Amino acid sequence: MADSTILQPEGLEQRYERYKEKIKHFTIMNDIFMRNVLKETACTEYILQVIMNRTDLKVIDQTLQKDYKNLQGRSAILDCVAKDAENNFFNVEIQGENDGASPKRARYHCGLLDMNLLNPGNPFDSLPETYVIFITKNDALGYNQPISHIQRRIKETEDIFQDGQHILYVNSKKQDDTELGRLMHDLHCKEADKMYSNVLSARVQQLKETTEGVNQMCQELEEIYNEGEQSGFLRGEQSGELKKARETTLALLEMGMSAEQIAKA
């Protein structure tokens, strides 16, 4: 008869110590760490200023990890949607794998933004300019460019089709001595004192090196760990299976995966 003994979970204090070690290795390219960095609106604003090459860009509102609904089809949780002072909207996505940054996913994100930005009865021409920005770990498009701008054109004339929809791919492997390259370096940097941007460095230092920031990160990791248990991801009849599942969850947390991604792993 199979042993159905359930392995006792490690204590909260033990997990917090493990979390603290993992937090040291987080970068802004990690999903969990990114959304905590971007809770400081100045960080979102700086990233957009560099990518858009606009020092005058001012973020006046943003939402993080919001579930954008499609009542007739698939919804999606968007990492960050920011609004600037000129009523432009920017969806910033950090993508560690190429399959999370496919052209058709970018197209779908554009559609979700449109569906959620146009109120009933409003004219179509009141749709704002939208920018879907994928910051990718690898060269997702394969053009060996630091940044690729995608916009519809009229084939016969090469004129831009003025629908107000823009897609940008930013290749974070390109870390040359330009403002964009230095930003990409910072997104991959684990240590605040080695970052170029004072804005990003201050926020990373706060989250990694202050008691308040570390506790905030530990609490979030614990919430994700508990969500994993509640979803059944960590349940197993064999103690060995349960131990392996817990180790897997902690490893996925270290990679910066969200609760939703861990549940699907």
Language-model region placement:
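Short, well-ordered beta-strand micro-motif
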Residues: 134, 169-171
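Low-complexity, glycine/alanine/valine/leucine- and proline-rich hydrophobic stretches
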Residues: 154-163, 171-173, 183, 187-190
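Accessory alpha/beta interaction modules
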Residues: 1-163, 176, 231
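Short, charged alpha-helical interaction segments and adjacent helix-coil junctions
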Residues: 2-24, 28, 32, 90-95, ...
